[in-house]
Amino acid sequence: MGFVKVVKNKQYFKRYQVRFRRRREGKTDYYARKRLIFQDKNKYNTPKFRLIVRLSNRDITCQIAYARIEGDRIVCAAYSHELPRYGVKVGLTNYAAAYCTGLLVARRILQKLRLDTLYAGCTDVTGEEYLVEPVDEGPAAFRCYLDVGLARTTTGARVFGAMKGAVDGGLNIPHSVKRFPGYSAENKSFNAEMHRDHIFGLHVANYMRTLEEEDEEAFKRQFSKYISLGIKADDIENIYKNAHASIRIPPSRRNPRRRSPRSGGRWPSCRSPPARRRSRSTRPTSWPRSRPTSKPKRPRRRRPFFFSSWWCIILVLPCSSPVRR
């Protein structure tokens, strides 16, 4: 079929239907979303969970969510900016950090569902493919599906690093090794050792050594945070090993500290909760209100409009002339 030019006439604009708002903004791929949220009809109201992975310039977000008519509901979430709590203070957006974030969200959701003791996941990380095996007596493994959004699903992408961390954490996510680092499409072979190096950040350590030998100024500029914290190339593997172990101990999220309201400034303080406002209005005052000593001045009454000075007009009637006889 040849090229057909679209005729934008009156009928075209009359029948035109705009796309969804998030499609117009380029935020949601509804073709993929429809297949991620539609549940089998014989499962009725059972939610279909998704592992949502989103990448930004400074953070990695992993969420467990399911769809409802009114909107998606987030069950559990983990962020890479929480990793300094577990010992990873720099490199919060690389492949190793994505693995740690996926591991963190997996341990949190299993702890929330009280499945963390039944499904410990893969404790010895080798980079090879790992599939969760269901226990004989007990509930099945938590199953969810990877949601990458609009990210490119290339081989070695960080979204698959987060998925690998979630799988090693004990979640049942259908996947293959074709998108992990170390897979060769030409030979159709998978190098698990290369994948392990990416999980423990050894590819960053090798680049640090190479850059330090070739260009020391570029090394100081690119790895300034590593240098300020005293982190060397030989320390990176142990940092991530300790982080994996510490994530499994307290995966729960720490309650954020509430800041005290400002005493003064441009913006007013926060509104008090209803209970405090109710008690404040019902409690008696410590002293009665004092009456004013001086009597307030009464407002001056205004005269009616027709009594005003300019309205008073003297009507002079013309005198009749004397009658002549």
Curated annotation (Swiss-Prot):
Q: Where is this region: Disordered?
A: 247-300
Keyword annotations: Cytoplasm, Nucleus, Ribonucleoprotein, Ribosomal protein, RNA-binding, rRNA-binding
Compositional bias annotation for Low complexity: 262-273, 282-291
Q: Which Pfam families match?
A: Ribosomal_L18_c, Ribosomal_L5e
Q: Which parts of the chain span the membrane according to its record?
A: none
- What is known about its subunit structure? Component of the large ribosomal subunit (LSU).
The protein's role, per its UniProt record = Component of the ribosome, a large ribonucleoprotein complex responsible for the synthesis of proteins in the cell. The small ribosomal subunit (SSU) binds messenger RNAs (mRNAs) and translates the encoded message by selecting cognate aminoacyl-transfer RNA (tRNA) molecules. The large subunit (LSU) contains the ribosomal catalytic site termed the peptidyl transferase center (PTC), which catalyzes the formation of peptide bonds, thereby polymerizing the amino acids delivered by tRNAs into a polypeptide chain.
Indicate what this protein is called per its UniProt record.
Answer: Large ribosomal subunit protein uL18
- Per the UniProt entry, what species is this protein from, by scientific name? Anopheles gambiae
